[in-house]
Structure formats: C-alpha cells, structure tokens
Amino acid sequence: MRGLIINMGEKYNPYEDMLKSMEEAADLLGLEKDDYEVLKYPERELKVSIPVEMDDGSIRVFEGYRIQHSSSRGPCKGGIRYHEDVDMNEVKALSAWMTFKCAVVNIPYGGAKGGVKVNPRELSHGELKRLTRRYTAMILPLIGPEKDIPAPDINTNPEIMGWIMDTYSMFKGYTVPGVVTGKPVEIGGSLGRKDATGRGVMLMTKEILQRQGIPVSEASIAIQGMGNVGGAAARELYLEGCRIVAVSDVTGGIYQESGLDVEKLSAFLQTGKMIEDYREDGVRHITNREVLISDVDVLIPAAMENQITEEVAGSIKARIIVEAANGPTTSEADKILNSENIIVVPDILANAGGVVVSYFEWVAPRTVVSTCPPRIM
C-alpha cells in the first residue's frame, strides 16, 4: 500500500503476533495453559475461490475467506474486508480479536472475520456487486442471524451489506435482515452504525485525556487513516474542540501546527479525492511515518495492522495511543511503548463502538431497543 508503513524484514504474520500477545496477557493474569488453549485455534476456517464475470466478459477468480474463531459466547460476529493484502493469517487474527473485543464490552457474541483478496477500486460497481453476491453464496453455509453475522470493514459499506442480505434472503426464500449489520437504514440498519466505531474512538480518547488531566480543548491529535473509522473519529474530535494537527491516507499525510480544518478536509475527501491532492495555506505534506511520530498528545492509528513496529515505536512522541485500527501495534513494539510509559488504549476496547451498535441493530427486531443515535451514544 502506498504511504503506509510496511515492515520490509521477515514477513509479518498477524496471527502469530496475536498468539504471542495473548500468551503474554495470560501469563500476566496467572492463567494456566489449559485455561486459554482453545482460544489459540479457530473453530472453523473456510477458504473459497470466487469466479466473477468481468464487464469485458472475461472471468477472474478471487480468493475469499470466512473464519469463525469462537461461538462460546453466542453467534460469531465480525466484518468483511475487501483488500489486496487479505490472507488467511490476517483473517484468523482479526477473528480472534473480535472474540476478545465482544467479551471486553460484554455483548453475547463470539468472534469471526471475512475477507476477499481484491482491490475494489479496480472493479466497476457491477463487478463489485457480482463479486459480493458470489462470495455470499459460497460462505452461505457458515453465516446466519443465529450463527455468524457479518458487518462492514475496510472497503465495504452499507450497500455491500445490503447485497449480502439480499443474496442470503434469496437462498432462504424470505427476508432475513439479521444476517448482517451495518446495512442501509431503509432495510433495517441502525442510524448510528456508520460512524459508531469512530464515535467510540472519540469517547475513549476523551476519557483517557480526562484521566490524564489533559483538557480536551487543548489536546493535539494525529490520525493515521481517514477512512470510515479515522474520518469519523477526526470529525467527532474536531467538534469536541481537539486540535487535529496531522492526518493521512494511503497516499500520504498532511500537517498543520495550528490545527487542520477537518470539516473542509472531510468535504474534500468525500468527493473521492485523496490527501495527496489537498492544498490549503499553512498545510504541508508529510509521510505516514511522520504522522505516526508527530509531536502530539494523542496518536490514533486508524489504518491497517502492523503500522507501529519496533522500528517506529522508539520514535513515537505521543503520550497516548488510541488504537482505532485492529492490531496496529506489534507485540514487540508494544514492549517498547510500555518501557517509554506511553499509554495505549488497546484496539479491543478503543474501536468496540462499531460492534456495540451492531449488536443493537441485530437485537432491535427481537426487542423494543431503540437504535437512534442519542440512545446509542
């Protein structure tokens, strides 16, 4: 990926890193090996080959996955991402993190994750729809409102969730809104779901700032990633009075000491343009690494996993890190941050807002729970 930090040494294996972190945490808690042995292994792993007819009539075959890590607390829950770097080990790690995340916020879900190895920007709207429908058909035996409930993730959105719901419902012969969350409001989605993860990041950031005695209105913040999560977090924190001094996407970053105009930047990005194209007085362009090592109160990695590595950790100047992305910090980097007394709000808490609101969306038809944003947040 252009602009993001990539470890050029031995290939990073997120699943092995997750296992290492879990074992270290278990040791700190004084757990016996038998207490967590089952959590080292996913319950089910499905790899599928997805043939798709392209607009020119040719056939391309894409690689897809659905991993169910644990159903011990309830139906499996986890997003589906479309990204060219998706592989089995990444999806396995993400599914395990979902298990831990749902347990941390005490909602009755286990963990799952799905993904397709594709760059969705290279596909037309029709090709993306055909890919989604075929992928859904191939993971159909695993998913269902009482078994495994997908949701949006990187490069997937409410429209794609709507296609999944429609395809699943066609096979069942009746409408099944509960098979996915994060779907359009018009077909049973939650009004608060789209920005829920970013809003949760904002709430976690405010909480940790208050605990550290830093006035929210005086806090300086750098955000790596301006997608669904990072963009929403930036907007919410900006409205709270924080000074957003640096942000980035896959094309690079920008910096303004006095604080970026996040409303103007968000409007610019919503036109489909990238940060490398953004030009304003007082704004200078920097690299993603420079965003990560900005001299700020709070760093929010909101892009991919494996961004804060050993090489980066020693140069970080932020006093607080709020992990909006899943697995952005490697286990070795985490040790360095701890030795430097840098506070880390872990991903399984910091970005749990999305799955919490997904739970409300899923449970609403079964109860009288309201899913309007004021009630959710």
What are these regions (language model features)?
Residues G189-I293:
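Glycine-rich phosphate/diphosphate-binding loop of Rossmann-like nucleotide-binding domains
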Residues H83, A103-S217:
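Glycine/serine-rich phosphate-binding loop and adjoining beta1-alpha1 elements at the start
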Residues V48-D56, V61-P120:
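Glycine-rich, N-terminal phosphate-binding loop and its surrounding beta-alpha-beta segment
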Residues N13, D17-K20, V86-N89, L123-R134, ...:
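Conserved active-site and cofactor/substrate-binding residues in soluble primary-metabolism enzymes
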Residues G252-V344:
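Rossmann-like adenosine-cofactor binding region
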Residues M8-N13, I208, A318-M377:
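Adenosine-phosphate binding glycine-rich loop
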Residues G9-S49:
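Short, Gly/Pro- and small/polar-rich lid/capping loops
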